[in-house]
A protein has these predicted regions:
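Glycine/charged-rich beta-loop-alpha catalytic/anionic-binding loops adjacent to active sites
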Residues: 102-115, 249-259, 394
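N-terminal helical capping/dimerization or prosegment-like subdomains
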Residues: 1-85, 90-93, 335-337
Length: 394
């Protein structure tokens, strides 16, 4: 049977890659701010889901569009199925690509494009595994269901309507982790805080989504562009990381960092932190605006949450991480969003209490905190053992 499967997969490799290219070419960043009827996460995500379901229907599968929140592809009995759950939304593409992020290019055994790994390849893989089972008429004692989500990168709002409308699968596999089997997942702590911006800071903006180290941040200070540039240069904040230009309200300063997923913030460089650091050390603001900048600098520093009292580490999932991914100005206030991934050894409620206390001590008002519990399955669990055995045999 394994030889038949290998032969089928080899015969369909190019077709599979072409489907992956089609999926990757869709800019499916989850955008609830662009919601429309049937497209709660924006038009590009709606198009992404339609492409997947259309392809699945061409293979002869039963498909369902969950009103734009999710999609399902079913083989056999859906009420007694093993599920694959994958997501078709992506983190914003950021900069520094060697190829266009939504014009996928194959070089040898690699496909370059946003989402080619996380997680559209999982959608394609699961779809072709189901197609292989169907076309080879492989015997199964259960159904198989592919569940496609569209909001994994922004809080999993897609799974709320799914869980309300659909019967849970007998067991569900998540092809979005490391080889061979992930048996643990960190808990989460997501937070929004705010602080008054003061009169000398006309605006402060940074980042695109909560779960990415922000590659760019900008602000407007009420001095001339010449004064701002001179102060920054004297303090060692130089181009190309910092740019200064004139603005109607004063000087616009842009900081350029390096994007990285919130799961590994140590690989990035926060432009929000860079900008706050420059404003503080160059002496470009004072009074309430200086207090705001100092609070932002405190909040956005580091990668592991030590300053917020939430540092924790375990041998299975490693260190708790913290990313301040977004800064926005709303009226007279600056709002900051934090995405924390909590070690499985951490107590989420306790971490949230510590986090809130540290934020208030820094002069920040806490708007909200939300937590999810970690997941941990013993390595001796039969499901883990079965998956490891299958993966190593294949």
């Amino acid at each position: 049977m394994l030889e038949k499967c290998r032969a089928w997969l080899d015969a369909h490799e190019n077709e599979m890659i072409e489907d992956l290219k089609s999926f990757v070419s869709c800019c499916s960043v989850s955008r609830a701010d662009l919601a429309a009827p049937g497209a709660p996460f924006g038009p590009e995500n709606a198009e992404m889901l339609n492409r997947i379901l259309w392809r699945a229907a061409r293979f002869g599968f039963e498909t369902k569009n969950g009103n734009g929140y999710y999609g399902t592809v079913t083989l056999g009995k859906g009420d007694d199925a093993i599920g694959f759950i994958a997501h078709a939304d992506v983190v914003p593409e950021g900069n520094h690509w060697i190829h266009e992020p939504y014009n996928p290019v194959r070089e040898g055994d690699f496909l370059f494009g946003r989402g080619s790994s996380d997680n559209k390849s999982a959608c394609v893989s699961a779809l072709y595994i189901m197609r292989m089972i169907k076309e080879l008429n492989l015997p199964l004692r259960h159904g198989v269901k592919l569940i496609v989500g569209l909001s994994e990168e922004t809080g999993m709002q897609d799974m709320v309507p799914y869980n309300l409308a659909e019967k849970p699968c007998r067991v569900t596999l998540v092809p979005d982790g490391r080889f061979p089997v992930c048996y643990a997942q960190k808990g989460t702590l997501r937070a929004r805080v705010k602080i008054a911006r003061g009169e000398e800071l006309a605006g402060f903006e940074g980042g695109e989504v909560d779960n990415m180290v922000p590659p760019q941040a900008e602000c407007v200070v009420r001095v001339s562009a010449e004064e701002a540039k001179a102060a920054l240069t004297a303090s060692g904040f130089l181009a190309p990381e910092y740019e200064v230009s004139s603005d109607d309200a004063g000087a616009k300063i842009v900081a350029h960092g390096v994007a990285s997923h919130a799961a590994a913030p140590e690989h990035g460089k926060s432009a929000i932190l860079m900008l706050a650091d420059a404003l503080e050390k160059a002496g470009l603001v004072g009074g309430a605006s200086l207090r705001a900048v100092q609070a932002i600098h405190f909040f956005a520093q580091g990668c592991y949450g030590e300053h917020m009292g939430i540092a924790c580490e375990d041998p299975d999932t490693g260190k708790t991480t913290m990313t301040v991914g977004v800064a926005r100005t709303y009226g007279d206030e600056i709002e900051l969003h934090a995405d924390c991934r909590l070690s499985v050894a951490a107590n989420p409620a306790q971490m949230a209490a510590r986090f809130e206390e540290a934020a208030r001590n820094a002069g920040l008002d806490v708007i909200e905190t939300k937590t999810t519990d970690p997941v941990f399955i013993e390595k001796t669990d039969p499901r883990v053992q079965a998956l490891q055995k299958a993966y190593f045999e294949m």
